[in-house]
Amino acid sequence: EAYRKIKRLYWDDEAPYYDEERLKMIDKTVCPIDIVCSHTAPSFCYPQTKEGLDYWLTHDKNLSEDLDNERKVFDNIYSYLKENGFELSKWCYGHFHKHNTEYIDGVKFCLLDMDRGVKLDTECIN
């Protein structure tokens, strides 16, 4: 966290959080959520390890815990959407600077490597 603040890699209010009361305010008949675009994804999505993050982990003693917490937030959001009848079909994320597509429980999870110059409409949305 300190390293990210010094290097201005994060804004103070950037960390995701789970707010079930706000989620309850979403009327799925008016705003049917079927696609999620986020910085990272639930913990059950690729990658499930921190392999390749050694450099960053040595410069930020809180990074490992921060990553775990972020992914737990998205675990909770995913569970809420599924349990409350939202017809989730796609989830796009890019945090890990790699490319991967997988289907989990009927949802297409797309890890987008923006360095490849991907386009959301061709890589994930379609």
Tell where the protein language model's regions lie, with residue ranges.
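A structural motif corresponding to the C-terminal end of an alpha-helix
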Residues: 28-32, 76-91
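Active-site-proximal loop/helix segment associated with metal-binding centers of metalloenzymes
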Residues: 1-73
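Binuclear metal-dependent phosphoesterase catalytic core
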Residues: 76-84, 96-126
